[in-house]
């Protein structure tokens, strides 16, 4: 089952952004986490497409986050790069690289 640890809501330029975060241990690239990450990313991509199609001004941004990326995550949140989807945690990079090997 998928139970995000926290949500952050930000209103900007008439759009409600919902940042959905699941916190994991550093380097926890288990098969279970690979599957959760893959399906959660797809779920939120599909949801965002449906919201756009229905002209609903909401967007969901999903991240797996671990302690070694906390500082960078909050810096990207503070300066707006997170809303532009320019952030990827170390754990996400590891999950993606191992997923495509």
Regions found by a protein language model. Name each.
Residues 1-101:
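Electrostatic, structured charged patches in enzyme active sites and in nucleic-acid/phosphate-binding
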């Amino acid at each position: 089952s998928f139970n995000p640890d926290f949500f952050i809501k930000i209103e900007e330029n008439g759009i409600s952004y919902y940042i959905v975060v699941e916190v994991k241990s550093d380097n926890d690239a288990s098969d279970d986490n690979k599957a959760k990450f893959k399906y959660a990313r797809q779920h939120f991509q599909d949801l965002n497409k449906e919201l756009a199609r229905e002209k609903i001004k909401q967007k969901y941004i999903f991240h797996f986050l671990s302690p070694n990326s906390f500082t960078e995550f909050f810096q990207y949140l503070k300066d707006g790069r997170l809303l532009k989807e320019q952030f990827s945690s170390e754990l996400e990079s590891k999950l993606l690289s191992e997923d495509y090997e």
